Structure formats: C-alpha cells, structure tokens
From Swiss-Prot:
CDD domains (alphabetical): LipB
EC number annotated for this UniProt entry: 2.3.1.181
Protein name in the entry: Octanoyltransferase
Record-annotated site: Lowers pKa of active site Cys: K147
Keywords: Acyltransferase, Cytoplasm, Transferase
Additional remarks: In the reaction, the free carboxyl group of octanoic acid is attached via an amide linkage to the epsilon-amino group of a specific lysine residue of lipoyl domains of lipoate-dependent enzymes.
Active site: C181
Catalytic reaction equation(s): octanoyl-[ACP] + L-lysyl-[protein] = N(6)-octanoyl-L-lysyl-[protein] + holo-[ACP] + H(+)
Its biological purpose: Catalyzes the transfer of endogenously produced octanoic acid from octanoyl-acyl-carrier-protein onto the lipoyl domains of lipoate-dependent enzymes. Lipoyl-ACP can also act as a substrate although octanoyl-ACP is likely to be the physiological substrate.
Pathway terms, separated by semicolons: Protein modification; protein lipoylation via endogenous pathway; protein N(6)-(lipoyl)lysine from octanoyl-[acyl-carrier-protein]: step 1/2
GO MF annotations in UniProt: lipoyl(octanoyl) transferase activity
Any single GO CC term annotated in Swiss-Prot or TrEMBL for this entry: cytoplasm
Originating organism: Hyphomonas neptunium (strain ATCC 15444)
Keyword Transport: no
Amino acid sequence: MQNFPPVEWAVSDAPVPYEAALAVMEARARAIREDGAPELVWFLEHPPLYTAGTSARIEDLKDPARFPVFEAGRGGQYTYHGPGQRVAYVMLDVAARGRDVRAFVAHLEAWIIQALAAFNVEGGMRDGRVGVWVDRTEPGGPPREDKIAAIGVRLKRWVSFHGISLNVEPELDHFTGITPCGIADPRYGVTSLADLGRIISMEEADIALKAAFQQVFASPLVRVDPPVTGSVPA
C-alpha cells in the first residue's frame, strides 16, 4: 500500500455552528487546492440540526420547524446532526490519492467499519445504500438493518470536504423529523453504538476512528488546534 504524507487532525470539544464549520471547510479545501495547505480531518459535534444534500426531496423533511435546516451542498439527501454524534469532516487531496471517487467513498465506509470493529460491532456496506449498516434481524423475524453512520462528501477540483457522521449516543428520536437519507422502507432504521449496548465516550470513539483512518488511508494523523472553538445553544 502506498503511504501518504501526514494529515492534520483537529478535535473541537464544544458544539460548532454549522455555518461556521462550512466556511472553514470551504476555505481549507481552497487552500489545499491553491496553496498546497496540509490536508485536514476535523472531529466535532453540531447542535441539533438537519442538512439537505443535493438530492434532498422536500417531502422527506417531515418536521421543518423542529430544528434549523441547512443546505449543505454535499451529495446525498437529508440527515441529522447533533450532540452524541461524531462528525468527521475530511479535507483531502483526492487527486493525489488516485482520482477515483468511488474508491474514495469506499475508503470512507471502510474507515467506519474498521472503527466499529474495535467495539465488536459488525458494520457493512450495502449496494445502493451509501453509509454503514448493521444487521438487526431478530431470530425468526423479517430482515431488518439500521444505519449507524452516514457519508456525504463534495469534491471541488479533486479536494474533498464534508465527510462522515457516526452515531455514538445521539437522541435517535431527533431523526424522526426527516426521512434519513431518503429511505422510507420500514426495514431500514437508524441506530447508534449506545442503542447497540456499547456505552463508550466520544474520546473512545475518537481513538478508534483515528487508528482506523491511519490504516485505511495510509496517512499518520498529527494533532493540531481546532479551526473553530466555542459553544452554541443546544
């Protein structure tokens, strides 16, 4: 496997406003593209909100007054972000990493799957359903799968931004204001590590995500100060 240069890694401890995060991502992606700035992986949480991807359908926003709604500009449909969910925004030079968008998304999925394995959770990829899923089928019952992590990225001149969100211990009821990722089939729901009985801290999730990223993307992570700090109202 080819090894790549170190990637900067930042962790924001307080919830970050979505618009502030979006501005940081766009500025950093532009700096990577135009000035050769270091790549960045940014771990954070948001206050409760919904984001709409480029394929979002208005009928999938079932409760528009519940939380603020933002146009994200990323691929995908509606998703929820909030406390207890680890968001990881990835600003990477995909051109230097092979110029293969499908392979890049597969790497993001593999990153999450490997991190979940640290907690004895078997995640998997599914054809036609981007993200990471876990089998929740009861013995003798009908097939059922729940989504534990979402993926939504955008590339501009081969530099990525947006990224992944892993449900550690969010309020799963907050997902009911949308049709998550546009999937209304009752066989497919949403879950979290806590819902699966894995009660872990965000710091423990970060350790697993860091180790998995370094292996899957073949880049060491170097800790830096977060680009945005400060809390926002929940």
